[in-house]
């Protein structure tokens, strides 16, 4: 009962904050808000430079494997647990999912830098 109350309050508060976050910026629409600020001067060139999608994919892949390392670091301490099979199965599933994702990205040529 107590957990249900906390969960419902959190969901209601989150919904309220998300609604306010989407509603509030639409009150004052000025063209100056969309322009970049360059120390009071008019912008010399476009501040909205095109972003390389290949770089984005490589960066996201790096972050995923960095997160994998962070998740696998506690394994030496987890070996001391009584149920080592569960720990090894969890680690195997984590590495397998990441390897499948890497293979899929490689097959889609997401890691080739040809631009």
UniProtKB/Swiss-Prot annotation:
A Gene Ontology term for the protein's cellular component: NADH dehydrogenase complex
GO MF annotations, alphabetized: NADH dehydrogenase (ubiquinone) activity
Catalyzed reactions: a ubiquinone + NADH + 5 H(+)(in) = a ubiquinol + NAD(+) + 4 H(+)(out)
Domain of life of the native organism: Eukaryota
Regions crossing the membrane: 4-24, 55-75, 87-107
Pfam families assigned to the protein according to its UniProt record, in alphabetical order: Oxidored_q4
GO BP field: mitochondrial electron transport, NADH to ubiquinone
Location of the protein in the cell: Mitochondrion inner membrane
Recorded topology in the membrane: Multi-pass membrane protein
EC number: 7.1.1.2
Keywords tagged on the record: Electron transport, Membrane, Mitochondrion, Mitochondrion inner membrane, NAD, Respiratory chain, Translocase, Transmembrane, Transmembrane helix, Transport, Ubiquinone
EC top class, as a word: translocase
Protein purpose: Core subunit of the mitochondrial membrane respiratory chain NADH dehydrogenase (Complex I) which catalyzes electron transfer from NADH through the respiratory chain, using ubiquinone as an electron acceptor. Essential for the catalytic activity of complex I.
Subunit description: Core subunit of respiratory chain NADH dehydrogenase (Complex I) which is composed of 45 different subunits. Interacts with TMEM186. Interacts with TMEM242.
Family, similarity comment: Belongs to the complex I subunit 3 family.
Protein name: NADH-ubiquinone oxidoreductase chain 3
Organism: Peromyscus slevini
């Amino acid at each position: 009962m107590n957990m249900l109350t906390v969960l419902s309050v959190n969901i209601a508060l989150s919904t309220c904050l998300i609604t306010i976050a989407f509603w509030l910026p639409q009150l004052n629409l000025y063209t100056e808000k969309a322009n970049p600020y360059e120390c009071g001067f008019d912008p010399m060139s476009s501040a909205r430079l095109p972003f390389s999608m290949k770089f984005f994919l490589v960066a996201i892949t790096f972050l995923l494997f960095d997160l994998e390392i962070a998740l696998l670091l506690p394994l030496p301490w987890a070996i001391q647990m009584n149920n080592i099979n569960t720990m090894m199965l969890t680690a195997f599933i984590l590495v397998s999912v990441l390897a499948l994702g890497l293979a899929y990205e490689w097959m889609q040529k997401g890691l080739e830098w040809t631009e």
